[in-house]
Design a protein with these regions (language model features):
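A short, structure-level motif marking secondary-structure boundaries and short turns
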Residues: 12-13, 67, 94-96
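N-terminal presequences and immediately downstream first alpha-helices
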Residues: 1-21
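Short amphipathic alpha-helical surface micro-motifs
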Residues: 19-22, 34-37, 104
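Alpha-helical context
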Residues: 8, 12-15, 31, 61, ...
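Residue-identity detector for glutamine
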Residues: 22-25, 83, 161-164
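Conserved beta-strand hairpin/beta-sheet module of binuclear metal-dependent hydrolase folds
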Residues: 26-92
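Active-site HxH/HxHxD metal-binding segment of metal-dependent hydrolases
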Residues: 76, 86-166
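A generic structural signal for short
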Residues: 16, 40, 98-99
Length: 166
């Protein structure tokens, strides 16, 4: 064993220290700092939740909550949001929605929430457009204009064939 490996073995392994004993249950919020709440939404996969954040906010003088990310569009997430609105928002509406990126667990409920509260969605143009492209994908045969586009973008013949075969 080298001296470096022996020294590494003697080091104490770091541990995680959690500031809260339990995470919030879906449909509830836990205040982590003044004006900031931590929420969790369920996910139907191995990673069974996404952390979502609420920040006290005001738009045009009306108090509300800005949220960061929305959860995946599932019946369970919809039920959790409804429970939050009934119990944990102090009667305040959502004022704006920030989506960090276009993965379905981060942006999946954005449409429903923006319509329900008539608030704006904030995300980068690139993430928004990528999301729109992916939701427009019907799973049908690759369109000719898509093949031309990707060919002009420099995709190899193998990559284009993979795109066609999807």
């Amino acid at each position: 064993m080298t001296e470096t490996a022996a020294a590494r073995d003697r080091l104490e392994k770091p541990t995680l220290n959690y500031p809260f004993e339990q995470p919030p249950q879906p449909g509830s919020a836990l205040e982590v700092a003044p004006g900031v709440v931590w929420m969790r939404m369920p996910l139907p996969m191995m990673l069974n939740h996404i952390n979502i954040w609420g920040i006290e906010d005001a738009v045009d003088g009306e108090a509300g909550w800005a949220i960061v990310d929305t959860g995946m569009r599932t019946d369970e997430t919809l039920a959790a949001w409804r429970q939050l609105f009934a119990n944990a928002t102090d009667g305040k509406k959502l004022s704006r929605i920030f989506c960090t990126h276009m993965h379905p667990d981060h942006v999946g409920m954005a449409g429903w929430l923006t319509k329900k509260f008539k608030c704006r969605l904030w995300m980068t143009r690139l993430e928004y457009l990528n999301c729109r492209v992916l939701t427009a994908d019907t799973g049908r045969e690759a369109p000719d204009d898509g093949i031309v586009f990707y060919h002009r973008a420099g995709w190899s013949d193998a990559a284009i064939e993979n795109y066609r075969a999807r």
